[in-house]
Amino acid sequence: MASDSMSSKQARNHITKGKRQQQHQQIKNRSSISDGDGEDSFIFEANEAWKDFHGSLLRFYENGELCDVTLKVGSKLISCHKLVLACVIPYFRAMFLSEMAEAKQTLIEIRDFDGDAIEDLVKFVYSSRLTLTVDNVQPLLYAACILQVELVARACCEYMKLHFHPSNCLAVRAFAESHNRIDLMDMADQYACDHFTEVVECEDFVSVSPQHLHKLLSSSDLNIENEKQVYNAAIKWLLANPQHHSKWLDETLAQVRLPLLPVDFLMGVVAKEQIVKQNLKCRDLLDEARNYHLHLSSRAVPDFEYSIRTTPRKHTAGVLFCVGGRGGSGDPFRSIECYSINKNSWFFGPEMNSRRRHVGVISVEGKVYAVGGHDGNEHLGSMEMFDPLTNKWMMKASMNTKRRGIALASLGGPIYAIGGLDDNTCFNDVERYDIESDQWSTVAPMNTPRGGVGSVALVNHVYAVGGNDGMASLSSVERYDPHLDKWIEVKEMGQRRAGNGVSKLHGCLYVVGGFDDNSPLSSVERYDPRSNKWDYVAALTTPRGGVGIATVMGKIFAVGGHNGNAYLNTVEAFDPVLNRWELVGSVSHCRAGAGVAVCSCLTSQIRDVGHGSNNVVDCM
């Protein structure tokens, strides 16, 4: 009997459990279910209820039902619910949960607000919707900031950003500053930088605070064609604000990068400006600019100190060109890539007439010259010139000697083609090109043959650095004095190298990467002609033989090369202040033996030919 009783009880339990499971499954089919901890429990979730709840609150508000507080803003009365306000507006949450008298009041007066703005804000609390217009955005932003409704404040800032204009961006910036909206201040500043020359012509410009003017003029992001525009803006503000001269005259002029102004403008305009002449610190700034130009000339100022004022702004820094070279296929390129500093990206410019690897490249007076190299079949002596104004390459006079692995330098106008090699010989030949006459002539040869040499003009000499003499890579360095027509050896590098890049920065010569006799190098050395000494600086992030380098905005860019296993399309930049290399935007084509130079033109002048952005060729 006992066994029969147990069997009957187990059967009932089994039937009951089965019914529960069936009901559970039916409920699951109707709603969202998740199992709880108990075997026979479940959690019922009805997301639709939230929509009903939200809709009911909105209807209560619109119909004035169950309201327990009225906001009085001027003559406007807004009936609403304390709980709803406290859920969305931190200001009211703090008020209603405090011991303040307003916590128990049914009529709360809010002073110094726009009634329509508060009403719009309350409607947003109930509906999550807000209509922004040119007329209501400022009072709404003010209310959202004071009442701490960050969602609405951010929406107002984004709306105002969309409606920036040269005539209103400075006023918007001042409004943002008064409400400590750093995000909107930054947006307005960036717009003012992007449209600087238009903003300067607007009425508000002379009314900006000296602190704000200081911030604007110091920015490297100013969209200008030349530093004259910054100087003229500074003088315009200073002449309109004589009350600020005692404290801000020299501070304002110090934000103008006077050393980057042409000498004739410095002497003919800046030096004759009365407010500059009458201020001792302004005269010191003018002397700094003069000394910079002397330092760059043959009358060098040996102890000149570089600063931010000697560093071009982004829009006047020029365009970095990467020209020719070759990749994994072995075929030389005729393509060129141009670097946009603002976008940190490269685009393809008009192609050369000839394919060229191990080509010499230089920019002089706003034009780019590509000389010599190898086209895949033979060595070249030809030269072509790219003019950003026409976006075309034009053939110019050829060198006397066909060669690849040459280096180019420009000193006082002429272009020097230095060293190089062909299949039989490493050359010590040096040719000089006169741009006006379009003619080449020979000058004194180097003391040592140098193929794959690096070169740069520094102060009043042309330097030839490293290379290969046909037997081994070289650590020796020599420099050319055009007045003596003579090459003289200087202190040798610490590392033998060929296929290295050479550039100058802050009065020093930098040699980057290259090959020793066995492998590519990552080491970087710096030469100071004042002390005739070399020292090592931070190494590249990867070895780069056949690397192209150039200096842009106070940094040295190393483009492409070969790391011993593959051709590279990566690019890295050296910051001398941090003594560090960092990767920047990569070129599309993996390439070594390309020529790299900075052209003093605008990125917008170069026609983007529109191909190659996804065409990364075989790097192996």
Curated annotation (Swiss-Prot):
Recorded superkingdom: Eukaryota
Pathway where this protein functions: Protein modification; protein ubiquitination
The BTB domain, residue ranges: 67-134
Annotated organism of origin: Homo sapiens
Region Disordered: start-end pairs: 1-35
Functional summary from the UniProt entry: Substrate-specific adapter of a BCR (BTB-CUL3-RBX1) E3 ubiquitin ligase complex required for The BCR(KLHL8) ubiquitin ligase complex mediates ubiquitination and degradation of RAPSN.
Protein name: Kelch-like protein 8
InterPro entries (UniProt xref): BACK, BTB-kelch_protein, BTB/POZ_dom, Gal_Oxase/kelch_b-propeller, Kelch-typ_b-propeller, Kelch_1, SKP1/BTB/POZ_sf
Phylogenetic placement of the source organism: Eukaryota, Metazoa, Chordata, Craniata, Vertebrata
Residue ranges, compositional bias (Basic residues): 11-22
